[in-house]
A protein has these predicted regions:
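Acidic/His- and Gly-rich active-site-bordering loop/insert found
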Residues: 2-132, 151-159, 333
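Generic non-transmembrane alpha-helical segments
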Residues: 14, 21, 25-28, 51, ...
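Oligomerization/assembly interface segments of phage tail-like spikes and tubes
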Residues: 218-223, 327-336
């Protein structure tokens, strides 16, 4: 199937004409520090939702609403999720409905000393706009709304397609109420196709469609070697501290090449697209002296193989350290799952690995914390083919399919 785009030139002109105004709107959204973590000012997430709702109304959506959903934490506490924006415009008879997804919450700014600009002041440098959330994912919101503005201007507001909007407010915080939200607002969000504007570019100037995503299985590891803290000068030597044992245990998660060594985790077939090692090194900033971990193509290591990262540890800082021999150590790992795997299988495999590799007779346990299914698009389906055709028409280039 090849789609004909009869209004391509007019749509392109409309997007170009409105680009600077769209950029200004993005700048205004970036100025709102919408961090959905409880340690931050959550009223800013409300501000962000209100700003997005106003933009949705301006774009011609009907029934624009800011909604939340309740969810239950692991300890049984019922909590309310962060505000999301949903909106809709009905489809004409016989026309499909498309759901547009992005998120308006952002990551914390982190260490301000590492910023060359103010995190929440969008700063333009050449063809780049720097600011927290400028790319992830407030640009995604504006991509959707700018496209609708171009369609409204070119075809008129009654262009027959049904369009729904779902702008989440807690994606960077792990989407704790996401499943509950989908169940609560299933009818409002039902659609024939979903367009997600929240992924990485393949390369500047090259159109790309993300056709697969790895899943996630996060969990906490605890290593215990004694009943209470003791003095390292009196007992160190015959007794290893829990942090040292944790380091030994974490090292078993990978083999000598750096490939994941946990049995039972799925690996998907090699992707067709090549990702040159030189490009990965340039994109990631990895030191020249550090070899790339794992085996297989770089693309497969990124998209179709599992990956495990240590993302947190409960350990005293150097500033607060003392001559204490720690008897318990905790770490959180994030495991990315290949398409075709599932979090339940991954948590089980990780728990078995941790138990089997407990060092020096220490007690080692794994507790599941977070789960997310991997995903693979049916690339031959009409929606995916239409998206690829649209990219060819807009860019004049063959789009690539990435993970």
């Amino acid at each position: 199937m090849t789609t004909e785009f009869t209004h391509h030139s007019a749509l392109s002109d409309a997007v170009t004409k409105n680009f600077e105004a769209t950029l200004q709107t993005l700048t205004e959204l970036v100025a709102i520090p919408s961090i959905a973590w409880e340690s931050h000012d959550l009223t800013q997430v409300d501000r962000s939702a209100e700003a997005v709702a106003a933009l949705a109304t301006k774009a011609g959506f009907n029934n624009v609403r800011i909604e939340r959903a309740t969810y239950t934490t692991a300890d049984g506490t019922e909590k309310q999720g962060m505000p999301a924006v949903i909106a809709s415009r009905p489809a004409a008879e016989g026309y499909p409905t498309i759901l547009l997804y992005a998120h308006h919450d952002v990551q914390p700014a982190g260490n301000l000393d590492l910023w060359d600009t103010e995190p929440f002041v969008a700063t333009r440098k050449g063809d780049r706009l720097y600011g927290r959330g400028a790319a992830d994912d407030k640009a995604g919101i504006l991509v959707h709304l700018a496209a609708l503005a171009a369609l409204n201007e070119t075809l008129g507001e009654d262009f027959k397609l049904g369009v729904k909007l779902f702008i989440e407010g807690e994606e960077e915080a792990g989407s704790p109420s996401f499943v509950s939200f989908l169940n609560t607002y299933r009818e409002e969000l039902s659609a024939d196709y979903i367009v997600v504007a929240d992924s990485a570019n393949w390369r500047a100037g090259v159109p790309a469609l993300t056709t697969s995503l790895r899943g996630v299985a996060s969990g906490d590891i605890e290593v215990r070697v004694g009943s209470h803290a003791i003095h390292s000068g009196m007992f160190g030597g015959p007794m290893l501290d829990a942090h040292t044992l944790m380091a030994q245990l974490l090292a078993t998660l990978h083999d000598a090449t750096g490939a994941v060594a946990v049995e039972g985790l799925h690996r998907a077939p090699e992707p067709e697209l090549e990702y040159a090692e030189a490009d990965f090194r340039n994109d990631s900033g990895i030191l020249d002296t550090v070899p790339l971990a794992g085996t297989g193509s770089v693309a497969s290591r990124l998209w179709t193989q599992p990956a495990i990262s240590v993302i947190g540890m409960d350990i005293p800082s150097i500033a607060t350290s003392s001559n204490t021999l720690a008897v318990v150590s905790r770490a959180r790992i994030s495991t990315r799952l290949a398409p075709g795997d599932n979090p339940e299988n991954a948590h089980r495999a990780l728990a078995e690995h941790i138990k089997a590799h407990a060092p020096h007779g220490a007690q080692a346990t794994y507790t599941a914390v977070d789960s997310g299914m991997p995903f693979a698009t049916e690339v031959d389906a009409d929606g995916a083919q239409t998206a690829l055709d649209a990219m060819r028409a807009a860019w004049g280039l063959e789009p690539v399919q990435t993970g």
